[in-house]
UniProtKB/Swiss-Prot annotation:
It comes from Pseudoalteromonas translucida (strain TAC 125). This is Acetaldehyde dehydrogenase. SUPFAM superfamilies: Glyceraldehyde-3-phosphate dehydrogenase-like, C-terminal domain, NAD(P)-binding Rossmann-fold domains. Gene3D superfamilies: Dihydrodipicolinate Reductase, domain 2, NAD(P)-binding Rossmann-like Domain. The active site is at 129 (acyl-thioester intermediate). It comes from the Bacteria. It catalyses: acetaldehyde + NAD(+) + CoA = acetyl-CoA + NADH + H(+). InterPro entries: Acetaldehyde_dehydrogenase, Acetylaldehyde_DH_C, NAD(P)-bd_dom_sf, Semialdehyde_DH_NAD-bd. The keyword Ion transport does not apply. NAD(+) binds at residues 11-14, 160-168, 271. Pfam families: AcetDehyd-dimer (PF09290). It is an enzyme of class 1 (oxidoreductase). Belongs to the acetaldehyde dehydrogenase family. SMART domains: Semialdhyde_dh.
Amino acid sequence: MKKIKCALIGSGNIGTDLLYKLKRSEILEPVWMVGIDPDSEGLARARELGIKTTADGIDGLIPHIEADEIKIAFDATSAYVHGENSAKVNAKGVLMIDLTPAAIGPFCVPPVNLNQLNADIKNVNMVTCGGQATIPMVAAVSRVQPVEYGEIVATVSSKSVGPGTRQNIDEFTRTTSGAVEQIGGAKKGKAIIIINPAEPPLLMRDTIHCLTETEPDQAAITASVHEMIAEVQKYVPGYKLKNGPVFDGRKVSIFLEVEGLGDYLPKYAGNLDIMTASAARTAEMFALQMLGQSPSDSQS
């Protein structure tokens, strides 16, 4: 099968983990990695894998986009620079998959709304790692009955959180809470991130609380949650229900654990895994459309 060529912008934890995912794809071919530190481990690993690299930021990539037939770019830098990065690649006709909390384009949480995205869009936002882990659960409840309030708490190991993510904590909470409402279906959303310095590092843990407008239909919500867990596990095998749904009046609580594949950072970094796997899955759907195939033709 012909592959769609891609560029990775950002050579940190997320960009490097995503590189390994893309190398396994049957539809996507990573050809460039962009960084700003010539000595970064991410760029060194990319070179070892035969990927072209530049340490001159986005401007080091732009002159090569047409010659190298790049159709999709992934931004794993920071919300502060994403707008400029996106504008520059969009001007060259490249689709931008945004892994920062910038949220310029529409949100995408694959098992909830991937199939509803318009093929003509030029920027799609992957929310945040906490959003990718928890919004499917909010949606699993809200598709059964209206959710008045949704609150998510994402706990991640300190070692898995690089400087880019740390700079974007405020954007993380704003973007995630917005997507809990827009994609999860809660009338009001709230998001909290906890960075845990424990050693040895803990797996990503997520807690989701939903307040339903009426008495929860326990059987229907439980079935919906289990169905959604299975959908997420298709691309994140380490996504597991630890407890719940637990019902207390109108409050529905769900407790998750996310173990990574260990592509770049060890398995405790499930927060990287769910973000990069979601981005790869989203890009593969757009790539199939570019190749003129229906997404149902390939279950990647």
